[in-house]
From Swiss-Prot:
Mg(2+) binds at residues 85, 87, 89. This is Phosphoribosyl-AMP cyclohydrolase. It catalyses: 1-(5-phospho-beta-D-ribosyl)-5'-AMP + H2O = 1-(5-phospho-beta-D-ribosyl)-5-[(5-phospho-beta-D-ribosylamino)methylideneamino]imidazole-4-carboxamide. Binds 1 Mg(2+) ion per subunit. Binds 1 zinc ion per subunit. One of its GO terms (molecular function) is zinc ion binding. One of its GO terms (biological process) is L-histidine biosynthetic process. Zn(2+) binds at residues 86, 102, 109. Keywords: Amino-acid biosynthesis, Cytoplasm, Histidine biosynthesis, Hydrolase, Magnesium, Metal-binding, Zinc. The gene is hisI. InterPro entries: PRA-CH, PRib_AMP_CycHydrolase_dom, PRib_AMP_CycHydrolase_sf.
Length: 140
């Protein structure tokens, strides 16, 4: 193991490893239940703002823009704890979720399970109740 790898894996210096697009993957879970709420991406600015403010900030690949969770919907995330994985290319935030995490109005983005069916797969809705109407909130 190189000295650099050892420092990344065992050291106390936070040195996030951004991908070629300048992003790290972020997994957000509910601090109270442990449920996975969403998977998103952070650039350096989103990561710094999240650490500084205690609010979740992300980078939207589709909009190519920084955004604070809840800035439009009011469905915010207060960060209780942030962790990084062994090689510092992903972060996990444990949050107090206010309302829904998903832009579809659901508590979690993981509201469908994949089930085997006739050699293929199908989706089945689970925990899919909407907490808000996305058309009303986002004025689509």
């Amino acid at each position: 193991m190189s000295a650099h790898s050892h420092e990344i894996e065992e050291g106390l210096s936070f040195q996030p490893r951004f991908d070629a697009s300048g992003l790290v993957t972020c997994v957000a879970t509910d601090v109270a239940t442990g449920d996975v709420l969403m998977v998103a991406h952070m650039n350096d600015e989103a990561l710094r703002k999240t650490i500084a403010t205690g609010e979740a900030w992300y980078f939207s690949r589709s909009r190519n823009a920084l955004w604070r969770k809840g800035e439009t919907s009011g469905q915010t995330q207060r960060v209780v704890e942030m962790r990084t994985d062994c090689d510092q290319d992903a972060v996990w935030i444990r949050v107090e979720q206010i309302g829904a995490a998903c832009h579809t109005g659901r508590r979690s983005c993981f509201y469908r399970k994949v089930e085997a069916e006739d050699g293929g797969a199908k989706l089945v809705f689970v925990d899919a109740d909407r907490l808000f109407d996305p058309d009303a909130v986002y004025k689509k």
